[in-house]
Amino acid sequence: MRKALLSVSDKTGIIPFAERLTELDFELYSTGGTKKALEDNDIAVKSVSELTNFPEIMDGRVKTLHPNIHGGILADRNNPEHIKAMETHGIQPLDLVVVNLYPFEATVANPDVTEMDAIENIDIGGPTMLRSSAKNFRHVITVVDPADYDEVIEKLKTDTLDETFRKQLMIKVFTHTNKYDAAIVNFFSDNTSTLRYGENPHQKARFIKTDAKPNTLAGARVLHGKPLSFNNIKDADATLFLVKQFDMPAAVAVKHMNPCGVGTGEVISEAFQNAYDADSQSIFGGIVALNREVDKATAEKMHAIFLEVIIAPKFSDEALEILTAKKNIRLLEIDMDMDKDEEEFVSVSGGYLVQDKDLLNVTREDMRVVTNTEPTEAQWKAIELGWKVVKSVKSNAIVLANDKQTVGIGAGQMNRVGAAKIAIERAIEMNDNVVLASDGFFPMSDTVETAYAAGIKCIVQPGGSIKDQDSIDKANEYGIAMVMTDVRHFKH
């Protein structure tokens, strides 16, 4: 007779599942509350003590941690030595393990939870049985999710529990135990902090630090101000990423994950002034990052406006004295070294995506002029600035830039012409030195026409459209210089 071990905290569906197992001639073994629930419903069940010949002890902390349990789960039924060991030690094989775990996450979600409450809800025997049975999935069926009960029964009835399905159950187990262990780490670790709320007040949120190096947001040295909010953290990370792209003194202002003003200069105060002038309206309440020490002159400029967060590699004593006069502003020191092997993760329904960060640096030498007109030296400098910025703007993205600053940004539009029109509408200046940078190619020549109508004389774009020549021909017709990078910078 096949044997099943049932030990569940979530008893959803366990009674009808157990009844159907007995109909399929499974002998049931169970522990504690699960055994009582089965007995209360007149289902024949034996205690695991009959397998272990050892009672539950220590308030149930030790009941399944026994060689007779794990030998019965882990034995390779095709290995004669394993079968012999089972016979020698009186170990009975277990064919089905049904386990779900103490509700640790639900317990610690209670704001009044104590550390002892959390500790008592750390399951030990459950994860151990799950991992043992999942490892031996070719011989043992492992069920961690009540949603799988019906399908398991049907496959048992039709003898279609093939290796593919068993492996699916195995993967679900290790995903579950991984998440369970992560929840424990997150609760007890100093690397996890509960935020006031998430993107909106009705959303709960936490900040989990996985890498607290001094050049990361997680490793920031907080000099002043209240804790960062969820939105502060996201915006600060976007700001930090962009400002690190620049070698010369640079300042970046971000609102809602998009740069609103980027400036460079001979000194950092000039860079900030250029970033401010790029969009003096949108910078209000924004996040600013600078890649040089904040000095007195720069601090005085920033003190005059409302900013949520200022990030820099260092603040002078005079700058700190000026800026800390504002109680609510956050001041963070972060090193400006760029990690060369960073990955980024994006959660999606049922999983997550992983990709390398967009760190590719395209220089003038990598670009090619595709029109009769060549860019001027001032336009080349604007190309380099605009191309650095456009990869940090949500697609479809258009950035207008001169050799010192962005002058107009069109972000997150469903079509490229729309992004160009917004950038042009918001432009603080328009002259022969202003360059239009596009994160993606032009599928037709309408963006060139829009640029020409606004007086733009130079365009940089990736190229790669089957209609590239249409855009090139239109640029030649209008006397516009066009440069292609052969690199796309979509940002979703």
Swiss-Prot record:
Pathway it works in: Purine metabolism; IMP biosynthesis via de novo pathway; 5-formamido-1-(5-phospho-D-ribosyl)imidazole-4-carboxamide from 5-amino-1-(5-phospho-D-ribosyl)imidazole-4-carboxamide (10-formyl THF route): step 1/1; Purine metabolism; IMP biosynthesis via de novo pathway; IMP from 5-formamido-1-(5-phospho-D-ribosyl)imidazole-4-carboxamide: step 1/1
Bilayer-spanning residue ranges: none
GO molecular function: IMP cyclohydrolase activity; phosphoribosylaminoimidazolecarboxamide formyltransferase activity
InterPro entries recorded: AICAR_Tfase_dup_dom_sf, Cytidine_deaminase-like, MGS-like_dom, MGS-like_dom_sf, PurH-like
Domain MGS-like: 1-144
Annotated EC: 2.1.2.3, 3.5.4.10
SUPFAM superfamilies: Cytidine deaminase-like, Methylglyoxal synthase-like
The keyword Glycosyltransferase belongs to this UniProt entry's keyword annotation: no
GO biological process: one example: 'de novo' IMP biosynthetic process
Keywords for the protein's UniProt record, in alphabetical order: Hydrolase, Multifunctional enzyme, Purine biosynthesis, Transferase
The keyword Cytoplasm appears for this protein: no
Substrates-to-products reaction catalysed: (6R)-10-formyltetrahydrofolate + 5-amino-1-(5-phospho-beta-D-ribosyl)imidazole-4-carboxamide = 5-formamido-1-(5-phospho-D-ribosyl)imidazole-4-carboxamide + (6S)-5,6,7,8-tetrahydrofolate; IMP + H2O = 5-formamido-1-(5-phospho-D-ribosyl)imidazole-4-carboxamide
Positions in coiled-coil regions: none
Record's GO cellular component terms: cytosol
CDD domains (alphabetical): IMPCH (cd01421)
Domain notes: The IMP cyclohydrolase activity resides in the N-terminal region.
Annotated family: Belongs to the PurH family.
Name recorded for this polypeptide: Bifunctional purine biosynthesis protein PurH
UniProt organism field: Macrococcus caseolyticus (strain JCSC5402) (Macrococcoides caseolyticum)
